[in-house]
Structures are given as structure tokens and as C-alpha cells.
Amino acid sequence: MQIPKYENKPFKPPRRVGSNKYTQLKPTATAVTTAPISKAKVTANLKRSISAGPTLNLAKKPNNLTSNENTRYFTIMYRKPTTKKHKTWSGDGYATLKANSDKLCFYNEAGKFLGSSMLPSDSDSLFETLFKAGSNEVQLDYELKENAEIRSAKEALSQNMGNPSPPTTSTTETVPSTKNDGGKYQMPLSQLFSLNTVKRFKSVTKQTNEHMTTVPKTSQNSKAKKYYPVFDVNKIDNPIVMNKNAAAEVDVIVDPLLGKFLRPHQREGVKFMYDCLMGLARPTIENPDIDCTTKSLVLENDSDISGCLLADDMGLGKTLMSITLIWTLIRQTPFASKVSCSQSGIPLTGLCKKILVVCPVTLIGNWKREFGKWLNLSRIGVLTLSSRNSPDMDKMAVRNFLKVQRTYQVLIIGYEKLLSVSEELEKNKHLIDMLVCDEGHRLKNGASKILNTLKSLDIRRKLLLTGTPIQNDLNEFFTIIDFINPGILGSFASFKRRFIIPITRARDTANRYNEELLKKGEERSKEMIEITKRFILRRTNAILEKYLPPKTDIILFCKPYSQQILAFKDILQGARLDFGQLTFSSSLGLITLLKKVCNSPGLVGSDPYYKSHIKDTQSQDSYSRSLNSGKLKVLMTLLEGIRKGTKEKVVVVSNYTQTLDIIENLMNMAGMSHCRLDGSIPAKQRDSIVTSFNRNPAIFGFLLSAKSGGVGLNLVGASRLILFDNDWNPSVDLQAMSRIHRDGQKKPCFIYRLVTTGCIDEKILQRQLMKNSLSQKFLGDSEMRNKESSNDDLFNKEDLKDLFSVHTDTKSNTHDLICSCDGLGEEIEYPETNQQQNTVELRKRSTTTWTSALDLQKKMNEAATNDDAKKSQYIRQCLVHYKHIDPARQDELFDEVITDSFTELKDSITFAFVKPGEICLREQ
């Protein structure tokens, strides 16, 4: 670096600001005349004195902007001085430079004067110089050249020029006369530099609105600033414009970066969620088939709503819709006057600054990847807490997230980790603008610490995502709804009195023919639907059929081995069941044991119920040596056929880790490469296991625990899935089966469900097909289709007795219930039944005051027949479009893997229901 050489120069007197050269004024020694002088004479003499003497460049007040064509205009950026490494500008404005002047005057975008600064000596560095103006640092952006830009700048600067400043000096006052030897006037030095400013009178009392002068509203609004949306709707193809209320100042338009990827149902979902979080009432849509997402409707406010429950089926893109909503609220707001805006009136910040996303720990990595996929992490700051962090490091990271504004906007955290940092979140809860809860059905327990922690944060805008919000418990339903929109259903006591009691009574099998109770229950159900549909959105995955590859569903009924039949008989005899006292809760242990027998008799010996109630050592030894079963035989044949006949991967799902152990051993013996995910896998390893399976072509199989690992996973690397056993809750199986048929899948999918013929496996399948009625009614899948199925999720004594029955003389008990066809692969069309009318007639006849024993027995028989008919009808409705195939008569199962392996499986498969995909149908 070159250091300038020191030179001892003589002192240079300072010059006045605004003067191009140094001027020294000396007072004269002439005697002052005391006689008064006329004003005109003083003025004339003063002009002569100034013109004859040295030139004085008297600075004018910068705000006095006259229409001077030689004035140059610039745009500027300004900020307060800061020592930050990454500096940002806090505002925009203008600068003016008058002709023959070396001073820049700076103003903010509203025309307020910020300060002035001298031009740099080097004119080439004009736009690189950092000027000091008052308490701000200022830098020139560019010079305005276009007439329209200059006119706009003049208008902005003239807003603060309504009241011109008073003159700095008075030329009309009588001044004493001073003469020098040359007969010329000179002003005294003290008077020349004194500023006689006129101060406005300041009232002693504080002014209130009552003392203010009333200005007409029209004149106030005439100069009101205009605001514009972040995106120009005219430059976007098929834009998504959000609805608004009457107070909105600007439209909110979804960023086309995301909007162009959204499907029609996702566009509707984003608008629905936005309306709910903004507290807008639902619009009245006459024709739901018309796309209303391109128009902004002015809606009334709904003060009861500030949250939303998105209950779409798995695979409909709930994560993408949520990211779109988050990005929209971070960048935009309808109330532009409440945030900082650019000089052109575009909001610079959005409605939300900090957003908290809470999800299962297995989905944290997936959420961050989705943000990176759709937005790029350079656009939005996403913070996740590392699993290697200590508790203190986590707390510090959360504190920094909330207090540092511009680094991170989104915090993704697991439900369990939420408890450890709850104190930091609660201290700064006013900084959190929005809460997103993925897999929100985990909050259904009112006593949950996680739920109470989230409630204590008191975040107004809440979004819950779930594919299974409710099955059959209205208490859990109330807990979730009251968390989303507190108080909308009233207190729990009033909710129980008004809704739970009448609906539960109507669903009780003992009241199935009580017309009054059923009518009241139906009325309360409809009332609840009207309340909750304002903020609950539920769509099924049927709308994905036109976007995803075809999917073929195959239900295979597997013949049980003789050892399995023997195990069923021994267990049922040893249990000594008393069906008169038996309930579903008391028989859960026995049900689980029988399900294990369906998977493999070798699981019996380690079962707790078997050890405590049966303890047959001789039978146990014979079972433990028999690891095979009908389903295991079919499974291994399918796996071998998939490996040899295709280049596809496969996912095997079970509800029991012990069953996965057996399958894993068999796959190891067969030399099938695989990976596994269950409850024993640490959370930090799960994401890497899924990624490895999807990307590594050498991995053939994926063993998945339905309950421990089936939440939110994306396994599109596989195109075939085998559900080895069933769960009582149909949503568990549906969620597990949806792991492969979702966005990102490129191949046709095949879903296999294995069921042991005539055993408890098949009874569970039948219950699954009949269930979901309560969920469908309250979430809007179908309001009337399942109107009569309000009690189909309850067990009576006959149901339990049938549950423990083993049918060895049937090819499919399910097919026997619904159809009498020959199983030749035809799709059966069922005639409409008059079931509802028969049910109503039975109800009316059961309300008579007296009946004889003979009539009572007749009615009981009719009721039993009616129940069987109803059960058949519900199962039949769920199996619409399925082909009925008896392998003894038809060897085409619409799948090349099963067809090629049919010689091995012919004795192991007793029946099949097949719902072919589009490709299979075209090939036929």
C-alpha cells in the first residue's frame, strides 16, 4: 500500500459551505450614521454593495424545489450506520442536484428531507460513494432520464412542499447605514450570518383530535398512496388470486414459481387454507366445476375461524399446498399500509415473518427437501435442529431463530423435541405468526403434553395436516377442532350434551329401530357437518387417477396350512370363551393371537396371551417348529416372481415386527437384498434408509412396519407393495399402501393384500370394508351414501361369535356374502336394493305398544336377515369394479407375475378380487 508523503503546508483558512472560493469579509471603521434611511434606498444600496463586492453563494433551503429544467434527479438507497457483516438497505428515496451546485440533497420516498452532502472530487465515483446525510448512510442508485420518471419524482418530492418555509433573512427591515471611503454599503458581518427564522407558536396545552381542524375526507384521500401487488396478474398465465375482505388494500397472488406446478385440486386447497387463516367466510359457489381460483372474491369476515384442517387422503400433495401457503404469507399481505413498501407501492414484507412447522421426526428431512425442491433454500430460510445438538444448543438455536429476523423464516421441529424447547418458544411466542402441524391426528389426546404445549403458545393461525383425522371417537374429534379454532364448538360439556350423546345413542345397535333417536342423531350430525365444513377440507385420492400411473389392486385369499387349522382349534378350545360375557376389549388379546396364527404358527409360543391363558407345551413345540403358512408361501413365490420377471422393487408391510423377522430371514435365505424400517430404527437414520432404497438399484426389497414407519414416507423407488396382514383401523393399511402410488411414481403400481381364507384375517377385511362411515360423514366424503351405516363400526355378540369362527369349507367367505357368481373374472353389476325402505318399515313396526311372542320372534328373524343384507351391501359397495376370480376356473389374474407363477400358487390361492389398472384393461 502506498502511504502519502507528509508535507508541512501553511494553514488554509476554512471557506463557507456552498462557496467555491474562500471569501474574507472585514468590517469597516466608518462611523455609523444614526439617521433613519428609507427602505427603498437601503435595498438599492444593498444590491449595489453585493454586486460590487465579492460573490456570496447564499444557500437556499433544500426543500424549496422550484421547477428547474437543469435539476438532475437520482434514486437512492439509505440506511442507518451499522457494523453488520451483511448490510441491507432500509429504504428508497430520491436525490436532487441543481445546476451550478456541488451539493446533493436527499429525500425519502415520501418527500421528507434527509440531509445533504457535497459532491465527491472524483465525478467518476459518484455512484460508488457512500454519502453521510443526517443520521443516515446514502448511496446513489441510478439517474432518472425518462420524463415519466422525473415527473413521478417531482410529484413525490412536492408532497411535503405544501407549506413553504419563511424567508431566512428580512430585506424590509430598517437597518443602520454604514459607509466606507468608497461610498459603498456593506452589511455588518454579524447580521449577514444571522438566520432570523420565524418559529411557529406552540400551544401550552396538548392538542387532541377535538382541537384539530377537520379536513374533508376527499382531500385526505386525494393524495393517498396507491399500493400494488407483488405480482402482476396480467403477466401470469392462469394465476391464483386469493380472496379478500373489504378492508384489503392489495391483491395477494400466488407466486407463479409455485402456481404453475399446482394441480386443480391443489389450487383450490391453497385458496381454502388462505381463507381460513385470514378469517374469511366460505364463498357461495353455484357451479363447483368452474375454476374460481383465478378471481378474487370479496368475502365477509368469520370471527370464529383462524385455523384449518386439511384432511386430504395421502398422496394429494398436502406438503406442496402448505409450502405454497407459507411462501405466500411470508412474501405478501393484503394490508400493504401496515408494512414497509417500495417507492412504487409494492409490499416488501408479508403477513407472517416466523412460521413453526411441527411434524414426526421421520418427516423433518422430507419437509426440508420439499422446501428446497419447490423454492430453493436460497429464497427461504429453513432451520432444522441437528440430532447431534445438545439441549442447550437447541435452545440457543430456537432463541436465535425468533430474534434474528432475516436469516430464517421457518423452523421445522419434531413433536418430541418441541417439549425440550417449549420454554424458549413460550418466552417469544408473540413472534410466531403461524403454526403447521403435520400428522395432526397425533393431537387427538386432550391430556397430551405436546398438545398443551402448543396451546400455551397461543398461535392464532394454525394449519393441521392429516389423512386420518377421525375414525369413531367424537371426544378426539372435539379435541382437534377446539385446538384449531378454540370455542367454535362451545365447551366440552355443551358439545357432549348437544352432539356426542344423541349421535352415540343413534349409533347404538340397541336403538337401530328407534325412529326418534335415529332422527335426532342424524340432525345433530348434519349440524356438526355445517359447522366444521367451514374449515375442514377433505378429498379422496380418486382425483389422482388422471395424474398418476395406473394402479392394480389385488386381494389374494390364501389357503391355510393344516398346522394353522389345528392351532386355531387348540387355541379356541383352550381359551374357553364365554360369548355371553365377551366384549371386544376383553377379547383383544385373543384376537391378536389368532392374527399371529394367520401369519405363522411359529409366533404363538412368544405371545403373552397364549402364555397366560393356554400354556399347552406340547402344542407350542409343534407350532414353533412350523414356521410356514399359506400367506408366507404366497409371499415368497411373489417375491421370487418379481425379482426374476421384472426389474422392479417391492415393499413388504406388516403390523408386527416378529412377522418382519420371519420374512427377513426367508429373504436372506433366498439371497434377496433388502433394507428395513420399524420402531427400533433411530429417527436420525430413517431418512437415510428411505433415500438409499429409492436411489440404489441394488436394493430389491423394503421391509416396513405399518405403525412405526408408515407415516408420511415416500417409497416411489418401488412399484409393487405386499400388505402381509391387516389392521383393525383401515387408515393404517391405506396409509401404508399409499407409500408407492404417489407423486414421483413413474411406473404402473401393483398392490397385493394377503388374506387367510375363512379365518380372522378375512373377518378383519370385512370390517375394514364396512368401516369409515363416521369419518366420511363428518369430513364430507359422502353425506348420504352411508347414511344407514352409522353403527357399522360397533360389535354385537353375534359379530364377536362370528369373529372367532373358522370356515374351512369356503373359497372366500367374503365372496359368499356378496355374490354367487362362478368366479370367471367378470365385473359384477349389482341391482339397486330397497334396503333403506325395509329398514324404515322395521323401525315403524318396532315402535308398536304391544306385540306377541310369535310376532317378536318373527321380527327378530327379520332383523337378523336385514343385518346380513346390510353387511353384504356395504361390502359390495367397497368392491365395485373388482373382478371375481376363482383360480380353479380362471387362470388370468391381470398381473404377469401371478400369472407366470400360477402353477406354483394354484393350490395356495383359493380366490381373488382384482381391480385392474388402465394398462391391464387396454391389454385385454
From Swiss-Prot:
UniProt motif DEGH box: location: 472-475
E.C. number(s) listed in UniProt: 5.99.1.-, 3.6.4.12
Catalytic activity as recorded in UniProt: ATP + H2O = ADP + phosphate + H(+)
Gene Ontology terms describing biological process: double-strand break repair via homologous recombination; reciprocal meiotic recombination
Superkingdom field: Eukaryota
GO cellular component entries: nucleus
Entry-linked SMART domains: DEXDc (SM00487), HELICc (SM00490)
Recorded family membership: Belongs to the SNF2/RAD54 helicase family.
Record carries keyword DNA-binding: yes
Biased composition, class Low complexity, residue ranges: 168-178
Classification via CDD domains: DEXHc_RAD54, SF2_C_SNF
Gene3D superfamilies: P-loop containing nucleotide triphosphate hydrolases, SWI2/SNF2 ATPases, N-terminal domain, Tandem AAA-ATPase domain
Residues reported in the UniProt entry to bind ATP: 346-353
Bias (Basic and acidic residues) ranges: 1-10
Major place of residence: nucleus
PROSITE patterns: HELICASE_ATP_BIND_1, HELICASE_CTER
Purpose: Involved in the recombinational repair of double-strand breaks (DSB) in DNA during mitosis and meiosis. Has DNA dependent ATPase activity. Promotes D-loop (displacement loop) formation with RAD51 recombinase. Modifies the topology of double-stranded DNA during the D-loop reaction to facilitate the invasion of the homologous duplex molecule by the initiating single-stranded DNA substrate. Required for adaptation from G2/M checkpoint arrest induced by a double strand break, by participating in monitoring the extent of single-stranded DNA produced by resection of DNA ends.
Cross-link (Glycyl lysine isopeptide (Lys-Gly) (interchain with G-Cter in ubiquitin)): 615
Residue ranges of domain Helicase ATP-binding in the record: 299-487
UniProt keyword ATP-binding, yes or no: yes
Helicase C-terminal domain residues: 631-790
Descriptive protein name: DNA repair and recombination protein RDH54
Region ranges (Disordered): 1-21, 155-183
